[in-house]
């Protein structure tokens, strides 16, 4: 039985025994036939080295890591079938590693865009012409944005902050993050001012009087939901002339980290501020460091153009 016949037998099994959809079968067929045509002697008799060479070839042809991984998955399934049917005495895919997916760079905002966003929040918070509920919402949003950009907190950490953070008015506070680990977070003067303004407005809402949270709400958790904050943030961005699709609380956290690194912060310090347990998580920002080094050389090297 040649490779083409064995591929057909595999597809028949996938259809009859596993109920694979037509689209799934078509995808398997394309991937297996492409592999078979790319390997001398066909796929069914291939050794591990042959399959590895094929994977190297499609990588050089520009296939994305996700496409490479999908093709390898189809090949693995094919050889499991051959082994189970007694058509192979080994599985050559057992020693092959899946292609590593490139970690996407985090979305972020420029310093100018972030400045526009925060300035807009400040203007709205100071608008005496707003009605009571709108003014309350504007003061809350201004405090949220200032604190998020000043600290780089995770959105879940931000919305669940205790009211004591604002009452103490300290330059630092402790936050409990992932894995129940605590870390010290600095607060800028602007963030403290925005929090105090919100705290004063919050004190005038009887429903909030007994809440232990800085941003209380009538929710199951007792504090503002991440979804409501994300919605309000997108609305603020649109009013600041920034595409709302470009922004989220997570993007503002990334802006905090990127802007620190652009202005000379150490990667380890940023790791601690973000609450990353492993430096490898923070290393998604190394592109910022690389850009900074290029600028440094271009600006200061005596022979730079």
From Swiss-Prot:
InterPro entries to which the protein is assigned, alphabetical: CB (IPR044068), DNA_brk_join_enz (IPR011010), Integrase-like_cat_sf (IPR013762), Integrase_catalytic (IPR002104), Integrase_recombinase_N (IPR010998), Integrase_SAM-like_N (IPR004107), Recomb_XerD (IPR011932), Tyrosine_recombinase_XerC/XerD (IPR023009)
Residue ranges annotated for the Tyr recombinase domain, each copy included: 104-298
Keyword vocabulary terms for this entry: Cell cycle, Cell division, Chromosome partition, Cytoplasm, DNA integration, DNA recombination, DNA-binding
Gene Ontology CC annotations of this record: cytoplasm
Principal localisation: cytoplasm
Domain of life: Bacteria
SUPFAM superfamilies: DNA breaking-rejoining enzymes (SSF56349)
Biological processes, Gene Ontology terms: cell division; chromosome segregation; DNA transposition
Single Gene Ontology MF annotation: DNA binding
Active site per database record: 154, 178, 250, 253, 276, 285 (o-(3'-phospho-dna)-tyrosine intermediate)
UniProt subcellular location: Cytoplasm
Domain (Core-binding (CB)) ranges: 1-83
Keyword Cytoplasm in annotation: yes
Keyword Methyltransferase tagged: no
Family from the record: Belongs to the 'phage' integrase family. XerD subfamily.
Role description: Site-specific tyrosine recombinase, which acts by catalyzing the cutting and rejoining of the recombining DNA molecules. The XerC-XerD complex is essential to convert dimers of the bacterial chromosome into monomers to permit their segregation at cell division. It also contributes to the segregational stability of plasmids.
Complex and partners: Forms a cyclic heterotetrameric complex composed of two molecules of XerC and two molecules of XerD.
Protein name per Swiss-Prot or TrEMBL: Tyrosine recombinase XerD
Lineage, broadest ranks: Bacteria, Pseudomonadati, Pseudomonadota, Alphaproteobacteria, Hyphomicrobiales
Gene behind this protein: xerD
């Amino acid at each position: 039985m040649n490779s083409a016949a064995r591929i057909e037998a595999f597809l028949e099994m996938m259809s009859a025994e596993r109920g694979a959809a037509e689209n799934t079968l078509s995808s398997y067929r394309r991937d297996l036939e492409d592999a078979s045509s790319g390997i001398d002697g066909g796929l069914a008799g291939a050794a591990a080295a042959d399959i590895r060479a094929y994977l190297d070839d499609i990588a050089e042809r520009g296939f994305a890591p996700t496409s490479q991984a999908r093709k390898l998955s189809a090949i693995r399934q094919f050889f499991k079938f051959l082994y189970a049917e007694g058509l192979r005495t080994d599985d050559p895919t057992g020693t092959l590693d899946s292609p590593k997916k490139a970690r996407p760079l985090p979305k972020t905002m420029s310093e100018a865009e972030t400045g526009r966003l925060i300035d807009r929040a400040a203007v709205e918070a100071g608008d005496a012409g707003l009605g009571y509920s709108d003014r309350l919402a504007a003061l809350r949003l201004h405090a949220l944005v200032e604190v998020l950009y000043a600290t780089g907190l995770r959105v879940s950490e931000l919305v669940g902050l205790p009211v004591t953070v604002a009452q103490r008015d300290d330059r630092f506070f402790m936050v409990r993050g992932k894995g129940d680990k605590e870390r010290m977070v600095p607060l800028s003067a602007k963030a403290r001012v925005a929090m105090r303004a919100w705290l004063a407005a919050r004190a005038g809402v009887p429903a909030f009087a007994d809440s232990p949270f800085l941003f209380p709400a009538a929710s199951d958790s007792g504090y503002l939901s991440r979804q409501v904050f994300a919605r309000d943030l997108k609305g603020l961005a649109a009013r600041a002339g920034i595409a709302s699709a470009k922004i989220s609380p997570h993007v503002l956290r990334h802006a905090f980290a990127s802007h620190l690194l652009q202005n000379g912060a150490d990667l380890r310090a940023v790791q601690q501020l973000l609450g990353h347990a492993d430096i490898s998580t923070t290393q998604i920002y190394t592109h910022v460091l690389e850009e900074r080094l290029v600028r440094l050389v271009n600006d200061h090297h005596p022979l730079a153009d």
